[in-house]
Amino acid sequence: MKFSEKWLREWVNPAIDTQALSEQLSMAGLEVDGVTPAAAKFNGVLVGEVVECGQHPDADKLRVTKINVGGDELLDIVCGAPNCRLGIKVAVATVGAVLPGDFKIKKAKLRGQPSNGMLCAFVELGISEEGDGIMELPSDAPVGTDLREYLGLDDNIIDVDLTPNRGDCLGIKGLAREVGVLNSIDVNVLQIPAVTATVDDKVSIELVNEDACPRYLGRVIKGINLDTATPLWMVEKLRRSGVRSIDPVVDVTNYVLLELGHPMHAFDLNAIEGGIKVRSANAGEELVLLDGNSVKLNESTLVIADHNKALAIAGIFGGEQSGVTNKTSDILLESAFFNPVAIAGQARSYGLHTDASHRYERGVDFALQHDAIERATALLLEIVGGEAGPVVEAVAADKLPKVTEVRLRRSRLDRVIGHHIEDEKVTDILTRLGFNVKVENDSWSADVPSYRFDVRIEEDLIEEVARVYGYNSIPNVAPTAKLKMTTHNEATIALSKFRNTLVARGYQEAITYSFVDPKAQAILHPESQPLVLPHPISIEMSAMRVSLMPGLLASLAYNQNRQQPRIRLFEHGLKFLSDENAENGVNQVPVIGGVITGLAHGEHWVEEKRNVDFYDVKGDVEALLAITNDMSRFEIKAEQSDGLHPGQSAVIYVAGKKVGFFGALHPQAQKSLDINNATFVFEIEMSAIEKRNLPQVAGVSKFPSNRRDIAILVQESVNIGDILTAIEKVGGNQLVDLNLFDVYKGKGIEPNYKSLAIALTLQSVDRTLEEKDINLVVDNVVATLAEQFNASLRD
C-alpha cells in the first residue's frame, strides 16, 4: 500500500524524520518497500491567474496571455494548451525557474510574441505521468504562492508491503494507530458526525446469504452534480496513494477506502429494480463488469442484486449496468461487511484483483460500516451536492464475528520473550493497540478489537507486545537450558536399527504422502474403510492411508517406468484407521513396510541372475524380527491378506494378534496399479518389534556338541514353523541349534505328503552327553511330532 507521509502526519505526527519513520514501521512488521518523492525537483513555479487570453496573430494553436503572479507587472506568456482561458488559476514557471530535467526558463519569443515564462502541466512538473493541457488550480488558490508550498509537494510517498494478517493497516487510520503506539503518542481521531437525512427516499435491503454478508448499509443520495470536479487536495492524496482520479463519486469512495481502510461502492439508483438482495449467484447467471468484460458467475460467488438481476460481485467489482456515469443524478451508497471466507479466492477465479477484494479477503473492521457511510456521505454532499436519505441497515447480529477474549500470562510472556517488560508498559501497548485490557493476578485479559482478525491466541498478544516494545530493545542473552541426561531403556530398539538393517539388505528409504488415491487403496485393501478428507489437495490425494502399500507401490511403479531393474524401497510412518474409541475417531498406528521387485542381486559374474521371490521378502522380514532377540514369540502363518497372492502370502501374529503381513502382490492388483514383474511387499506394526529380549550372559560350553538328523513325513498342509516351534519346546536346554536343511516332495513320497530333514544340535554346559541322553531328547522330539502332527520317521 502506498500513502502520503503528510497525510499520515495529519493523523499522528511523531518527532522523527522520514527515514526513522520507515525503519520504525519495518521493525514493527509493516515492511517499507520504498520511499519516493511526491513530485520531481523544481523551483520558481508560482500560482498565477490568467487575466487576459487572446489568439496568437500568427499561430492558430497558440494563445497570448497576461498572467498575474502577484508582482507589480503582468507576465506576457505564450501558451499552446487548449484549456488555457480567461480567469483560471494556473502553475506559472517564471523566468529563472528550473524544471525537472534541469530545464531552465528563459525569456523567449514565439512567432514574434514575447513569452516571459511558461504555464505548466502536471507532466512537465513531474507530478503525474498523465494529463492533457495545463494545470488548473482551485479558484481560491492564492496568487503568487509557491506551487510546492501550495500543493504540499515537499512530501514523500511511502510504500509498505503488508503481510496478509495485517489488513487493519490498509488505511491511513490503521497506520496512524500503529505509529501512535510505536511512539507512545495520541492519534488525532477523525470525528465523523452523522449526516441528517433531508429526504425520505430509501431502498429495501434483504440479506439472503447472512453467513457471507451479516451487515449491509445503504443510503440514497439524490440530485448530485457530476459536472463538478474533484477537489485538487483529494486528487493529490489519491495520486500519492497510487489511485487515479476518475469522477467525484468514485474518488470519494476510493478516498474513504484509503483513509479508513473500508471499501465502498456506489450504484446508479435508477438502475435498481425493487430493492437490494445480497445473495449467492444463480446457476448460469452472467454479469457485465465496469471494465466491459462479461463473466459467467459461479454459484459460490456472493452478488449484490436487485429483484431481477445481479448488480455487482460483492466486495470485488461493480457491474456496468448499475455503474455511475456522467448522466447519473441519484445514487445508492453501499457500506457492508463481507465475511473474508466468502470473498477469499473469488476475485482470482475471475482473473481479478481489486483494492476492495484485497481488503475484504483479509478482513475489514465489522464495526466500521456506519462511520464509512457517514464519512462518504459528508464528502459527497460537500463536493457534488445533493440530498441524503436515511441510512438503511440490514444486519444478522448472530452472524457477525464475536469479540474474542485472549488471556496473556506474565510467566508465558517472560518465557517467550526472554526479557521482563514492566506491567505498565504491557498494559499501555495493548491499550493503545485498541484492546480492552483488564489486569488480574499476574495476567492480562484482552478483548480483541473488531479490526484485528489475526489475534486469537496468547502467542498473538506476545507478538504484539514484543514488536511494539521493539526487538532491538530486548537485550541479547544467550539461551540457557538445563541438560538432563535421559535414561536409556536397553530393551527399546531404536528406529535406526531397523533402518540400518534394511539398508544393509539393499533397500532405500522412501517418504510418501499420508494422503492417497482412494481407488488405488481400495484395490489393495477392499475391506478397509478409509478416512476421506473434506477438502483434499486433489482427488488422487483425498483419503488417509490405511497402510504404507499405496504410496510405496506408486513409488515403485514410478521407478519402474524409469527403467530401474532392481527396486527395494522401505518406509516408516503412520497408517490411519477409523476407530470410534480413539481420539478424534482415528487410530494412528506406526508401521514399517517395504516393497521389492526385479533382480534379487545386482548383475555379477559369480551369481546367476534371478528375480526376487517369496523367500527373499520372508528373509527380510525375519531379519527385522530377529532384532528383537525373541523370534519364538512371533507366529508366521500361511494366510491370505488383502491385495496379496492367495498362495504366496503370510500373516505375522504375536499372542494371537495380527501385527503384520508379507507376500506377493496379487496379479490383479499388480495389473490395476500398472506394475510390471512379480512384486513382494511386507508391513509390520512397530509396537510388535520395538522391544527386545536383553541377551543373558552364559558361559561357553567346553563339552562337545552332538548332531542328530531326523527325516519325517508329514501332510503337505502342515506348517513347518509349527513343527520347529514344537521341537524347540520339547528339546529343552540341551537343544542348542535347530535347522531345517531339506524339504522333498516327489518320487518315493506319497501324494499330499512332504519329507522334512531337520538337524538337531545337542550340547550340555556341565558334562559330555552320553548316547542315552541324546537318544532321550530325539525320542521325545519324534514322539511329540507324531502326536501333534501325525508325523512319522522316513525310512
Swiss-Prot record:
Keyword Magnesium: yes
EC number(s) stated in the UniProt entry for this protein: 6.1.1.20
Principal location: cytoplasm
Record's keyword terms, sorted: Aminoacyl-tRNA synthetase, ATP-binding, Cytoplasm, Ligase, Magnesium, Metal-binding, Nucleotide-binding, Protein biosynthesis, RNA-binding, tRNA-binding
Cofactor: Mg(2+)
Residue sites binding Mg(2+) per the record: 454, 460, 463-464
SMART domains per the UniProt record, alphabetical: B3_4, B5, FDX-ACB
One Gene Ontology CC term in the entry: phenylalanine-tRNA ligase complex
HAMAP family according to UniProt: Phe_tRNA_synth_beta1 (MF_00283)
Record protein name field: Phenylalanine--tRNA ligase beta subunit
Organism: Pseudoalteromonas translucida (strain TAC 125)
